[in-house]
Amino acid sequence: MSAFTPASEVLLRHSDDFEQSRILFAGDLQDDLPARLDTAASRAHTQQFHHWQVLSRQMGDNARFSLVATADDVADCDTLIYYWPKNKPEAQFQLMNLLSLLPVGTDIFVVGENRSGVRSAEQMLADYAPLNKVDSARRCGLYFGRLEKQPVFDADKFWGEYSVDGLTVKTLPGVFSRDGLDVGSQLLLSTLTPHTKGKVLDVGCGAGVLSVAFARHSPKIRLTLCDVSAPAVEASRATLAANCVEGEVFASNVFSEVKGRFDMIISNPPFHDGMQTSLDAAQTLIRGAVRHLNSGGELRIVANAFLPYPDVLDETFGFHEVIAQTGRFKVYRAIMTRQAKKG
């Protein structure tokens, strides 16, 4: 996080307006403007662990990571700067949460790329903080209003649920494949062999569907799940509980919080971070897997067929196999051998 996003560049056009403000930054925090903008005081709340890692190094305890913000997270703030995400239900969850905590009279700024649908903020907040567009640049919109009425926020009302082959999947706004199992994950699941044993790590676990489906036909596996997303971590915990499957679930930026080695690492890695295309997580996953696989252990991932992962797999493991494919997706397998680079 060094270069500013277009949304932050729009905010910087108004930097003089923020010098006396006590600001809470929230939403899709893709850079470190919250730590660098000249203000009377700054706090940040994010649901993304990797964004919190960067901000906490500069802001300390004034940067918070959690699914739901608390009164302590917004204490003494008189201004909210909210970065609109690409997912409207995610924005609604976060904004209703934050506006239920901030005092009436709080200045509300909403900024985001036009392609993210930021203009829908006006309708979403009409009953609580009527917004007006105050700037348009860098293909972004900046909206301003003042909090007139606090909404009632109930996190439980945002939970969703669907079934896959008799399994219950719990979801929240912002979780990948919130409304159903995606095609890539279906392809990966089709390759998992029944009666597998050993320690399995699910990186970027989303709602936990890969893990519970795997555990159903391989009940002796020992599961560990991780994701950068607080909604995903909570959804996976709920999915495991709903299907009576045991496993450890925690927030991690790929392997940042992962300890030990595993017999298999599975993943449907993301290639977007907010609105931006990013292959960093998947490349970190592939290169870091050798430090977390036992000898003979296996990395198995599914990815869009056009993404350039074969070269990274070969560079890291010495070889790879494509064990399933469709027109759009491929499932890759790489085995931990003496050929593999040890990181």
Curated annotation (Swiss-Prot):
Gene Ontology terms: cellular component: cytoplasm
Chief localization: cytoplasm
GO molecular function: 16S rRNA (guanine(1207)-N(2))-methyltransferase activity; nucleic acid binding
Pfam families listed in its UniProt record: MTS (PF05175), MTS_N (PF08468)
The organism's place on the tree of life at top rank: Bacteria
Keyword tags: Cytoplasm, Methyltransferase, rRNA processing, S-adenosyl-L-methionine, Transferase
EC code(s) of this entry: 2.1.1.172
Residue runs in coiled coils: none
Reaction it catalyzes: guanosine(1207) in 16S rRNA + S-adenosyl-L-methionine = N(2)-methylguanosine(1207) in 16S rRNA + S-adenosyl-L-homocysteine + H(+)
Subcellular location: Cytoplasm
InterPro entries: DNA_methylase_N6_adenine_CS, Mtase_sm_N, rRNA_ssu_MeTfrase_C, RsmC/RlmG, SAM-dependent_MTases_sf, Small_mtfrase_dom
Role summary: Specifically methylates the guanine in position 1207 of 16S rRNA in the 30S particle.
Annotated family: Belongs to the methyltransferase superfamily. RsmC family.
Subunit structure: Monomer.
Official protein name in the record: Ribosomal RNA small subunit methyltransferase C
Source species: Escherichia coli O139:H28 (strain E24377A / ETEC)
Lineage of origin: Bacteria, Pseudomonadati, Pseudomonadota, Gammaproteobacteria, Enterobacterales
Primary gene name: rsmC
